[in-house]
A protein has these predicted regions:
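Short hydrophobic core segments
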Residues: 299-305
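Active-site substrate-recognition segment that forms the wall
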Residues: 28-74, 87-97, 118-130, 138-158, ...
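N-terminal secretory signal peptides and thylakoid transit peptides that target proteins
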Residues: 1-15
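Flavin (FAD/FMN) cofactor-binding and adjacent substrate-gating region
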Residues: 10-14, 47, 54-75, 147-149, ...
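N-terminal FAD cofactor-binding segment of flavoenzymes
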Residues: 173-193
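Short beta-strand to alpha-helix junction loop
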Residues: 87-91, 173-177, 255-270, 370-374
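A conserved short coil-to-beta-strand element within the FAD-binding core of flavoproteins
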Residues: 281-294
C-alpha cells in the first residue's frame, strides 16, 4: 500500500510513485556497471523569469476506478470511459480498447466521441482503426483541454483506484489496459518531433531511501495500491543507486532509472493530425445535459469527458484533484527527469518545456483552476539549489 499522507509528506509528485517505490525497495544495490555511461548532465537554468507557462490540470479521481460501462441514454448507446485519476495519458490506449469492446460496432458504422483530451483522442483513433466513421464533439481541443496540463510521464497507477476498491477483477482489467497501452507507446518511439521517448530519471534524497519521511497531518485522500510494482514490474528496468562521483547533485543519496515520457504538445498534435487524416471530424459543441445526446446522428456515443462528467452526468463519485504544472524555456540538452524527495519537487525535461511540478496539501477535492504562480516560482527556486552556480 502506498500511504498518501506519507507520500505527500515526502513531497514527491505522485507521477514518480512507482520510481520512488522501486528506489525504496532496492536500497542496497549500487550499479557501477548496470548502465552504459551517460552523457554529462546539462544543468537546468532554473530561474523564475524563464517560466513560460503555468497551468492547472484537474484529475478526475473515482475511488472505484475508471467508469468503463454501457448504458442507454436519450435513445443512444452510451459507453462511459472516464475517471482515470492521474493515469489518463498512460492508460488511454488500453482504456479505449476496453471501452470499445463493450459495443463491438460493425465496420463502417458511425460513432461519436464526446471529449478531445487524452481519452477522447485515443478512443477516436482506436475506433477509426476498427473501421468506424468517427466524429469528436468537444467544448475544447488541445492545447486547451485539461489533460494538456498533465505532467507527461508514464504513471499508470497514479490515483487510479482507492486501495479499498482494488479487487482482483479490477486489477486484471487494469493490468490488461496498462500492458496494451505500454505496447502502443513503444510503437510511437522515434517519430518526428519525438512525441514519446525514454528519459533517464534521477531520484534524489537527503536521507536513505529506506527511511520514511512523515510530515504528519491528516488528509481525506485515500491510500492507493502499488499496482505497477506488483503486476507489471517486468516493463521497467530496476533503478540503481549512484555513487557520489556518478552524479553532480548536491545530495547524499541518488538513484537512476528510466522513465517513459510524453512530450504532450507534439503528442497531442500527432493524435489530432492522425485522426483528421483518417477522415475524422472535430466539432466544437457544448453539452449541458445528457438529454442532448438525442440530437446526435451517431447511434453509439463514447463519453470521454473526464472531470466534465461530474457536471454533465451529475456523477458525484468523481473527485477533483488539482494538479499545477509549470514549464521553463526548453533546453535542447535537458532530456532527463528529477524527483527530489522531501522537497516537493518533480521535474520532467520535456522538449516542449522543462516541466516543474509541486503539490499542495489541499489538492485532493480541489477544483480550483486558477494558477498559483508563487507556488511554481518556489518550486523553481528549489530546483536551482540542485545546480549551484560556481561563478
Amino acid at each position: 500500500m502506498l500511504g498518501r499522507r506519507r507520500f505527500v509528506a515526502g513531497a514527491v509528485a505522485l507521477s514518480a510513485a512507482p520510481f520512488a517505490r522501486r528506489a525504496f525497495a532496492a536500497e542496497g544495490s549500487v550499479g557501477r556497471e548496470a548502465f552504459a555511461p551517460h552523457a554529462p548532465i546539462t544543468p537546468i537554468d532554473a530561474r523564475a523569469d524563464r517560466l513560460i507557462d503555468v497551468r492547472v490540470c484537474t484529475r478526475p479521481f473515482r475511488a472505484e476506478g475508471p467508469r468503463i460501462e454501457v448504458e442507454r441514454i436519450a435513445g443512444k448507446t452510451v459507453v462511459h470511459n472516464y475517471g482515470h485519476g492521474g493515469s489518463g495519458w498512460s492508460l488511454s490506449w488500453g482504456s479505449a480498447a476496453a471501452a470499445l469492446s463493450l459495443v463491438d460496432p460493425k465496420p463502417g458504422s458511425r460513432l461519436a466521441v464526446i471529449g478531445c483530451g487524452a481519452i477522447g483522442l485515443t478512443t477516436a483513433l482506436t475506433a477509426q482503426r476498427m473501421g468506424l466513421r468517427v466524429r469528436i464533439y468537444a467544448k475544447e481541443r488541445p492545447p486547451e483541454v485539461r489533460s494538456a496540463g498533465a505532467t507527461g510521464v508514464w504513471s499508470p497507477d497514479s490515483r487510479i483506484v482507492a486501495e479499498a476498491h482494488s479487487t482482483p477483477a479490477f486489477e486484471r482489467r487494469w493490468e490488461a489496459m496498462a500492458r496494451y497501452s505500454f505496447r502502443r507507446y513503444q510503437s510511437l518511439l522515434g517519430l518526428p518531433g519525438d512525441p514519446i521517448e525514454w528519459h533517464a530519471s534521477y531520484f534524489l534524497s537527503d536521507v536513505p531511501f529506506s527511511q520514511a519521511i512523515d510530515g504528519g497531518g491528516e488528509s481525506t485522500e485515500p491510500d492507493y495500491p502499488d499496482l505497477e510494482d506488483r503486476l507489471i514490474s517486468d516493463l521497467h528496468a530496476r533503478s540503481v543507486a549512484l555513487l557520489p562521483e556518478q552524479h553532480p547533485f548536491p545530495v547524499p543519496f541518488a538513484r537512476r532509472g528510466e522513465q517513459l515520457t510524453f512530450n504532450i504538445s507534439a503528442y497531442a498534435r500527432l493524435l489530432v493530425d492522425d485522426f483528421e487524416r483518417a477522415g475524422g471530424e472535430i466539432v466544437t459543441h457544448t453539452f449541458d445535459s445528457p438529454r442532448q445526446f438525442r440530437s446526435l446522428h451517431e447511434p453509439v456515443i463514447v463519453n470521454a469527458t473526464g472531470f466534465g462528467a461530474r457536471a454533465l452526468l451529475g456523477d458525484e463519485s468523481i473527485v477533483p484533484v488539482r494538479g499545477q504544472t509549470a514549464r521553463l524555456v526548453p533546453q535542447p540538452d535537458v532530456h532527463y527527469n528529477l524527483y527530489y524527495r522531501g522537497h516537493n519537487l518533480a521535474v520532467v525535461g520535456r522538449r516542449d518545456g522543462i516541466l516543474v511540478q509541486a503539490q499542495a496539501e489541499d489538492d485532493f477535492g480541489n477544483d480550483r483552476i486558477e494558477p498559483d504562480r508563487a507556488m511554481s516560482e518556489a518550486a523553481v527556486a528549489r530546483l536551482a539549489t540542485l545546480f549551484p552556480r560556481t561563478t
